[in-house]
């Protein structure tokens, strides 16, 4: 049963995986009973997490078998809980682009959030639009989330600028991307078009670039002030390991002044 479970989690496309997540939630507590790792989002412990990723980025012990969080989801959740007033502020207007299924039920029930989701096509989103031309007025949102999107779009600077435009002055945003910390400069090559080649060069079949350590400069070009959050400077190594976070992952906090 465990082998079938693991195969499905790695073989199914993530959108379909998310739709079937209720099935995994039924079996996970029984199949992976234990306390070696912990997911702060679903607040459950397991004997281990599951492996996940493409052929290029396959990783062991990273996927929560209950709510399907990965390292980046757990990092963002812990940051919001520990380092911000996201869950306690009196009122925040939030725009969430390409909303992650693991966050949706939690954010939607927060009474302090005026929470709106958006996507190009996703049926679970409240609004549908192209990030290159956001049909919203200026300075509308206190907080914006847009994770693992900029590696897909034609013009990241245009999309970032549009998101910066709809943020209020004093607002902040998180826009995580796959980032190669060994690469100084973002890698783009318009001649790479086949899914197999894109996976090889950009880590996933539908990616069109691989961001390097210059990612903050892209964000600054779009008008953001960029602050760096390094979990290793704030949190204990034991809990970073227990939550199975990616130790080299940097979280960029974007401010609009």
What are these regions (language model features)?
Residues 91, 141-142:
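Local beta-strand N-terminus motif with an aromatic residue
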Residues 148-152:
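Short catalytic micro-motifs in class I SAM-dependent methyltransferases
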